[in-house]
């Protein structure tokens, strides 16, 4: 039998994982991406003349990658060395109010006690136990399934797991659910922020998203060379198995060709293939951007159902006044006002700001010279309406800087050379999204079941990435790529 050919359109996390699994199993794999390097959203830019991650910065669920690499005979730790963070994140509010979450659960409980009192510490202990129960119930029955299915979830969770899900009021919102554990508004704010990991509002997202707390407690890792290095490793390993990568190669059309497909690039070159894994936002297919034949292959995401976008700045500066670690969150005073603005399609007046200090780990001592920094604030996914006016972008940068200053962080070198990326730029990078970075918003308990599965309505055409099941985030996108590869292998070998 001739070697089966599979084309992967997109070299983001989902596409890279699919390419690794397929090439490791002996399939003829070609990967196409219009960018000059692998990574997709795990892209890299420069700050102070040095490379810096400009996309996802938090690496969790390392065992997913260990298992995937092991399935094709590789040792993930040898391929991508990483250090486990002892401080998961440092959180700050106005003045000197600061709180660290630790990898060690006992230390975190004691930190909550010192920060907010014994009642909140007891609530945090219950919250941690319940978030672990939710993850255990959903990991196999939902996250690792090829498509979202409510009955399958119930069956997979079993009689033992179902009470664990019901115990956290899965039909209520995350914000309301957090009220069962915390009276301190700052802690509700902190754990409510987990909804933004999937581009959603804690006031609309389901309470089951508390599972993110357990995922982080299970381990936050710092990969040597940054997150972009992870993308490079996946591409390198797939290439070693024989996969061929085509960069600066924009797939303009996917067309039927007998029982298979033809991919046509923007330069006119064509490639024949037996199956296609599309590692772009599912909305691009639904909107017919790769050919009108595929408009019904997967449901479209209406603009009002989009997840969040962001405005990010990457720059280099010396800092003082606040002891940065790798991951830092500076909370605004009014969390509800933030998400009300986003829901109305507006930039936030007083934004919560995330700062990744890529040159730091758990050591918060000042760095010699300028250090690489990424700052991020949430923004509405309105990038298809045009770029933000320069004065609005500058005003948002000023407001973000004021938030950092209110928490004590000062830049000795004003980041005038900061590279900003706003929703219209994300929309250009990831077409059909409006700049949404996480696919469909996870608002309401049904939302997770409305994401498309990895199999589309077209035989031989599959989805992989954060807009497909099981959802956004680096490990979830990896799981979708693994599932897409598994489905493609099963379907092709059964023909």
Task: State the predicted function of each range.
Residues 4-137:
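N-terminal glycine-rich phosphate/pyrophosphate-binding loop and immediately adjacent elements
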Residues 94-204:
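Rossmann-like flavin
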Residues 184-198, 350-354, 410-470:
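A glycine-rich dinucleotide-binding beta-alpha-beta segment and adjacent secondary-structure elements
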Residues 211-257:
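Helical element adjacent to the flavin cofactor pocket in flavoenzyme catalytic cores
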Residues 252-367:
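Mid-domain catalytic core of redox enzymes
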Residues 318-428:
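C-terminal segments that line or cap access tunnels to active or ligand-binding sites in enzymes
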Residues 466-488:
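A conserved FAD-binding loop/helix module that cradles the flavin
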Residues 490-495:
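Active-site-proximal substrate-binding core of FAD-dependent oxidoreductases
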